[in-house]
Amino acid sequence: MFDFRPFYQQIATSTLSAWLETLPLQLKQWEKQTHGDYIKWSKIIDFLPHLTADHIDLKSAVKAETKTPLSSGERQRIIHHLKQLMPWRKGPYHLYGIHIDCEWRSDFKWERVLPHLAPLQNRLVLDVGCGSGYHMWRMVGEGAKMVVGIDPTELFLCQFEAVRKLLNNDRRANLIPLGIEEMQPLAAFDTVFSMGVLYHRKSPLDHLTQLKNQLVKDGELVLETLVVEGDINTILVPTDRYAKMKNVYFIPSVLALINWLEKCGFHNIRCVDVETTGLEEQRKTDWLENESLIDFLNPQDHSKTIEGYPAPKRAVILANK
């Protein structure tokens, strides 16, 4: 089990201090509801060695190194422990000569998003649906004062804490295992990211409002989500599954998405990138035993999903509160 008290101490004297009114009780309730695998996964972090990196790079990668390389045996033991936390979805990580080659090349997405952002230097950042935290570390690498990720998935918390331990226990990033709908409106974050979340929401406008409620006035929203071609009235509502995913509800056109944001009261809304997801960005690796993008597409026509919908295309939208 993880101790969240260091995070409480961090935020006690910050603009997030109001969160202490609800968060400790919420996390106590969360711990009561965890399942058996969480206990097993959390113990794996205890088995990882306490290494001190001589060089950490979060600016161009998520990488830690020592001047003296690990022995083959040490490296294999770490790999063994980390593979107990499979599947690794978002990465990659380069830790002491170990390459965690995750399903997603999340560095590709970061390189698309980063040039358009308001500088993250000294900003308080929220990453909603952060997964195991790859992008959080890249945000720290850009100089963010503190990055808070929220994701209720127990495995992601354990993966994050494993990586943190191997990054000299860096406290500038913290993962809180809650959903955005469980957060009280803090209006405290300078930048809020929601990447790969909106299409999983039954009520997308509620999600956009929840994101807005976490931003300071004029703070920046970074929204990345699936889109389809079309006009302001075009919204794809899959009848059953989309790319084998059961929980996909609404995929708007870029114009429809901008309209949603306007209705929620955002301003300065702009689409800065639209990209079809490629097979080099999402694929099977030794760190993932499950199916990946190639299995979700029509084998005869990769412009369509296995169900016949348009293949995944993702837009990045920026807006201000």
From Swiss-Prot:
The keyword tRNA processing applies. Its EC number is 2.5.1.-. SUPFAM superfamilies: S-adenosyl-L-methionine-dependent methyltransferases. Disulfide bonds: none annotated. Carboxy-S-adenosyl-L-methionine binds at residues 90, 104, 109, 129, 151-153, 180-181, 195, 199, 314. Transmembrane segments: none annotated. It is an enzyme of class 2 (transferase). GO terms for molecular function: methyltransferase activity; transferase activity, transferring alkyl or aryl (other than methyl) groups. CDD domains: AdoMet_MTases. GO terms for biological process: tRNA wobble uridine modification. Keywords: Transferase, tRNA processing. It catalyses: carboxy-S-adenosyl-L-methionine + 5-hydroxyuridine(34) in tRNA = 5-carboxymethoxyuridine(34) in tRNA + S-adenosyl-L-homocysteine + H(+). InterPro entries: CmoB, Mo5U34_MeTrfas-like, SAM-dependent_MTases_sf. Catalyzes carboxymethyl transfer from carboxy-S-adenosyl-L-methionine (Cx-SAM) to 5-hydroxyuridine (ho5U) to form 5-carboxymethoxyuridine (cmo5U) at position 34 in tRNAs. Homotetramer. Belongs to the class I-like SAM-binding methyltransferase superfamily. CmoB family. This is tRNA U34 carboxymethyltransferase. The gene is cmoB.
